[in-house]
UniProtKB/Swiss-Prot annotation:
GO terms for biological process: auxin export across the plasma membrane; auxin-activated signaling pathway; cell differentiation; cytokinin-activated signaling pathway; lateral root development; maintenance of root meristem identity; phloem development; regulation of root development. The gene is BRX. Acts as a regulator of cell proliferation and elongation in the root and shoot. Regulates roots architecture and primary root protophloem differentiation. BRX, BAM3, and CLE45 act together to regulate the transition of protophloem cells from proliferation to differentiation, thus impinging on postembryonic growth capacity of the root meristem. Probable transcription regulator. Regulated by the auxin response factor ARF5. Polarly localized in vascular cells and subject to endocytic recycling. Required for CPD expression and for correct nuclear auxin response. Residues 139-194, 289-344 form the BRX domain. InterPro entries: Brevis_radix_dom, BRX-like, BRX_N. One of its GO terms (molecular function) is identical protein binding. Expressed in the developing protophloem up to the elongation zone in root meristem of young seedlings, in the columella and the phloem vasculature throughout the root and in the phloem vasculature in the shoot. Detected in the shoot meristem and in primordia. Low expression in stomata. Confined to sieve element precursor cells and to protophloem. Residues 203-286 are annotated as: Disordered. The keyword Oxidoreductase does not apply. The lineage of its organism: Eukaryota, Viridiplantae, Streptophyta, Embryophyta, Tracheophyta. It is a peripheral membrane protein. Its main location: nucleus. Induction: Up-regulated by auxin and down-regulated by brassinolide. The DZC domain is necessary and sufficient for dimerization. A C-terminal fragment containing both DZC domains is able to rescue the short root phenotype. The N-terminal part (1-57) promotes BRX membrane association and is required for efficient degradation in the nucleus. This is Protein BREVIS RADIX.
């Protein structure tokens, strides 16, 4: 950028300097003049660079404003904190004037946190940012133990959980399968989820959920069922005129016992635990209209009696220990007419 100027050294001081100046060549003068012009241009550029700039603190004529943002959810100590903003180019996004309350309505954040945490929640502190939650009452939560099985718990203040209800998807479980699953997995659920007690009032009178479109069947745990010795056996619910048939052991998938959770006919041969519960009160009417008949060992037929007295065949189940898929289809094709005539 700068041109180098050759200088001669001598032992003379001032006189030598004057002599050297006087003996400069035209090329040296031109170089000095060029250097002087360059320095002046640079000085003008640097001195005039900030003439059009205004201090960040601004003045009354500055288009940018230094405002104080008022947050309703912040402590008083945090209010009035200045937020400086730097200007941008003409094509950039215009600066946001935080002094204008129209950008942030006073109640927007308050209403947001009120809708989430309720009207009795504490506000958020700007210094600690801690949310104070109301701990009154047990907190309910749901766990999906496996696909189609949802269990609702309530956290107890003393630790552990209260088992509220169990829901089985009707697309994956019928009532009998749900009862068997509960009997086989009861101990695992109690240990895994630290179940301390059961809400008897909620479980003895379970309410039907309004969203029946989910096709969930509610089964409840009731301790009184284990204490009662007078539970009516399954065959007492059979309508008059039906042929009495009894269950036999030997199927791990379709073990003996009541279709609706009654005690098994033979406790030594059943695969269903004695902890099986009776169904909820909302299913009592279904118990009187639907039952299972064993046509032969390993073949279980579910029959329903309608309100007009007619019967319909609900399903036919085969024991996997006795029937393969092809064998079951063949058996059904051969015995379909006989089953419909005999049971319907």
């Amino acid at each position: 950028m700068f041109s180098c100027i050759a200088c001669t050294k001598a032992d003379g001081g001032e006189e030598v300097e004057h002599g050297a100046r006087g003996g400069t060549t035209p090329n040296t003068k031109e170089a000095v003049k060029s250097l002087t012009i360059q320095i002046k241009d640079m000085a003008l550029k640097f001195s005039g660079a900030y003439k059009q700039c205004k201090p960040c603190t601004g003045s009354s004529s500055s288009p940018l404003k230094k405002g104080h943002r008022s947050f309703p959810d912040y402590d008083n100590a945090s209010e009035g904190v200045p937020y400086p903003f730097m200007g941008g180019s003409a094509g950039s996004t215009p600066a946001w004037d935080f002094t204008n309350s129209s950008h942030h309505p006073a109640g927007r954040l308050e209403s947001k946190f009120t809708s989430i945490y309720g009207n009795d929640r504490e506000s958020i502190s700007a210094q600690s940012c801690d949310v104070v939650l109301d701990d009154d009452g047990p907190k309910e939560w749901m766990a999906q133990v496996e696909p189609g099985v949802h269990i609702t718990f309530a956290s107890l203040p003393t630790g552990g959980n209260d088992l509220k209800r169990i829901r089985f998807s009707r697309e994956m479980f019928d009532k009998w399968q749900a009862q068997r699953w509960w009997g086989e997995n009861y101990d695992k659920i109690v240990e895994l989820y630290n179940v301390q007690r059961f809400n008897r009032q909620a479980l003895q009178t379970p309410a039907r959920s309004d969203d029946q479109s989910q096709r969930d069947s509610t089964y409840s745990k009731m301790d009184s069922a284990r204490e009662s010795k007078d539970w009516t056996p399954r065959h007492n619910f059979r309508p008059p005129g039906s042929v009495p048939h009894h269950f036999y052991g030997g199927s791990s998938n379709y073990g003996p016992g009541s279709y609706h959770g009654g005690p098994p006919m033979d406790a030594a041969r059943t695969t269903t635990s004695s902890r099986d519960d009776p169904p909820s009160m909302s299913n009592a009417s279904e118990m009187q209209a639907e039952w299972i008949e064993e046509d032969e060992p390993g073949v279980y037929i579910t029959i329903r009696q309608l309100s007009d007295g007619t019967r319909e065949l609900r399903r036919v189940r085969f024991s996997r220990e006795r029937f393969g898929e092809v064998h079951a289809k063949t058996w059904w094709e051969q015995n379909r007419e006989r089953i419909q005539t005999q049971y319907l």
